[in-house]
C-alpha cells in the first residue's frame, strides 16, 4: 500500500512515503494506513522530515496504541519500534534515484594545504546520517582550490564484544573533521580521542554544499586548529587569526 495522506490533503514527498511504507512493514500488526494516522497524531500535519526527526519512540508507541487498539500491544516490541523509528528518520533508506557517488583515486600529499573530512550519510551523496548508526561515511579531501571524494567507508555490523563508537572513530582516524546530524557525548569523546573534530549540523544537506563552504573557509581565514591540520606554519596560523 502506498503511504499517502487522506483524500484532499497534499501528497507526501516520495522519500517520506517510502520511509513510512518500510516502517509499517517492520511493525507486526500495523499496516501503512494505521501508521500514517498515528504519525499525523504524533507530529501533526504536514508530515515533514524535520518533524519525523524529532519524533521519540515513546510518543510513537502511544499514538500507535491509540490508533490500532490494545491488540497491537502484545505484538509491538521495543526492537520493532526502534527499527521503525530509524526507518522513519531515513536511516538505511535509499531512494532508487540516489545512486552512490563514485570515489576518485587520491595520493597522499597530492593536494597542498588540504584537510580530510568525513560526512555521515545514509542516502547517495547527502550528509543525512547520525554518527552512531549511519550506513557509510563519505570521505573528501579538500584544499582551498580543489576537492575530491576519495572513499566510501561502511562500518558494517559489530561483534557483540566490540565498542561500536570506538570502531567507527578508528575508521575515521585519518580525517580531521567529522560532519554528522547528531553525536552523543561518549561517542564524541571517542572521535576526539582519534584526532577528529566533530561538527554537528541541524539538518540534512547535500555533502557537496558542506565541501564548498569549507573550501571558502580554507581559502580565507581558517581557525588556528584547522590551519594546523592543513599543515600551516605557526606564523601563517597567526596571520589567519588577524
Swiss-Prot record:
Keyword Cytoplasm belongs to the record: no
Top-level division of the source organism's lineage: Bacteria
UniProt keyword annotations, A-Z: Nitrogen fixation
The keyword Transmembrane belongs to this UniProt entry's keyword annotation: no
Gene3D superfamilies registered for this protein in UniProt: Dinitrogenase iron-molybdenum cofactor biosynthesis domain (3.30.420.130), Dinitrogenase iron-molybdenum cofactor, N-terminal (1.10.150.590)
A matching Pfam family: Nitro_FeMo-Co
Example of a GO biological process term: nitrogen fixation
Entry's family note: Belongs to the NifX/NifY family.
Name of this chain's protein: Protein NifY
Provenance organism: Azotobacter vinelandii
Amino acid at each position: 500500500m502506498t503511504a499517502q495522506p487522506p483524500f484532499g490533503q497534499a501528497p507526501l514527498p516520495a522519500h517520506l512515503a517510502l520511509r513510512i511504507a518500510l516502517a509499517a512493514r517492520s511493525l507486526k500488526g500495523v499496516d501503512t494506513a494505521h501508521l500514517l494516522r498515528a504519525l499525523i497524531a504524533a507530529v501533526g500535519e504536514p508530515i515533514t522530515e524535520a518533524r519525523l526527526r524529532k519524533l521519540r519512540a515513546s510518543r510513537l508507541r502511544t499514538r500507535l496504541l491509540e490508533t490500532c487498539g490494545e491488540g497491537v500491544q502484545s505484538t509491538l516490541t521495543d526492537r520493532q519500534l526502534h527499527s521503525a523509528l530509524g526507518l522513519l528518520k531515513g536511516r538505511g533508506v535509499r531512494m532508487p534515484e540516489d545512486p552512490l557517488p563514485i570515489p576518485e583515486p587520491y595520493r597522499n600529499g597530492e593536494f597542498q594545504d588540504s584537510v580530510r573530512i568525513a560526512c555521515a550519510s545514509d542516502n547517495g551523496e547527502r550528509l543525512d546520517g547520525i554518527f552512531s548508526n549511519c550506513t557509510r561515511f563519505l570521505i573528501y579531501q579538500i584544499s582551498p582550490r580543489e576537492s575530491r571524494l576519495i572513499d566510501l567507508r561502511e562500518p558494517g555490523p559489530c561483534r557483540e564484544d566490540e565498542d561500536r563508537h570506538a570502531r567507527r572513530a578508528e575508521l575515521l582516524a585519518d580525517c580531521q573533521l567529522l560532519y554528522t546530524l547528531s553525536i552523543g557525548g561518549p561517542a564524541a569523546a571517542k572521535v576526539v580521542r582519534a584526532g577528529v573534530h566533530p561538527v554537528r549540523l541541524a539538518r540534512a544537506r547535500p555533502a557537496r554544499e558542506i565541501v564548498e563552504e569549507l573550501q571558502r573557509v580554507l581559502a580565507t581565514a581558517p581557525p588556528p586548529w584547522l590551519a594546523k591540520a592543513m599543515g600551516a606554519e605557526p606564523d601563517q596560523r597567526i596571520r589567519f587569526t588577524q
